[in-house]
Amino acid sequence: EAAATVMGHDLAMGTAVALTFAGDADPFDSAGVDRASSALLWTAAGLGGYFAGRWYAGVAPHNLTVGDLQTLWTGATIGAMAAGTAIASSSPNSETVATSLLAGGWLGILLTERTLVRRYDHTRSEANLVALGGVAGALMGMGVGILAAGEADRGESLTLGFATLGAVAGVAMAERYIQPDRDA
């Protein structure tokens, strides 16, 4: 429950910060929200996240381990990377970037929860190996993307697309290799 509570806080506060930047590219200029109001709202979101995280741990229809929560962060990262792929070549403004990365991160969490967390109980070390598999796959995918693009433009959609596919493949291979216990 403690790890889920902290994760709930981090997700809620991160979401509040991203929504602040999605609504205004420079939220602290003279026309935007003042710093004290933003800090108060972000703190309130974090507090709400504590309760949401505890609630999630209590009502989840499956066993929830600390490793499962770490695996959700890996899914959030891959989801955000996939969203970055969709907008990388279009010169988006900062509001679009914040909204896309936020949505991609949340979709990554939902997909990871459905495919990995509900089915398996991950230990901390297994979750670390899953994350490492994702990083290794992303690096290999970036290499393929740079070779395919013929230039070292790391911000192109093609390169990020291959990195995302590599990360997904790395996570899948790590899951296959470690063979975590089925959900109890």
Regions found by a protein language model. Give the residues of each.
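Hydrophobic alpha-helical membrane segments
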Residues: 1-184
